[in-house]
Amino acid sequence: MKASLVQLSTQPLVTEREWTEDGIPVLTASCSLPQPVKPQGAAARRVRRYYQLQRRFFFRYCEAWLLPQARAEYHAALAASRPLPCFRAELGYRVTWNQDGLWSLYTHIRETCPGGPPLLGRRGDTWDLAAGYPVPLKAFFPGVRSWKGTLLAFAAGEIARQEAAGVARYHDHWRQALRRHFNPQNYYLTEDGLAFFYPMYAIAPTVEGTPVFTLPFGTPGLRQPAAQTPQ
């Protein structure tokens, strides 16, 4: 019987594109996503295809959504004799867990548009290397029906603590927003615990970026990653 992968070896694959108007750059895009470094079985092939598809979607998004805005801003600036703007989009990633048969990471996108703050986005992925498929969040709470409530209560406690200490600021209606904007796909594993996050603007002002809460391993009901991996 062929042994399952315990870790996944990858390297960044970087791709860049530039769009011009009248020979002037109006939009640049940079994409850095993981790529398995050598044949490692079906799981590695699925990972490769998954991030190849994400790369294509990113550049299609840039061309279909950002490029028309960039061209419009360019012509408006040209007509008003203002400095010519250039939009920028960056997609990158960070591997946060790579052991015990699980590979976890988040990808992050940053859009820089003239006249406004950078827009940030994040996506979490956790892969079961034995099965070759993503692991649903609830799999880390076996037998716990109220796992969502556990996460929401933890986030609420962290927000109350941060606001009391004056280290962060959240919307006045953050308690309702926590439940409304909770997405079980927005998580990844770290050495400290299970990190789950909310989109920019969803529960906090722009200055707070992407709010992240990390439920520590050892919390009742949260399964340790090593125990998640099939033997």
Language model segments and positions:
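Compositionally biased intrinsically disordered regions enriched in Thr/Gly
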Residues: 1-231
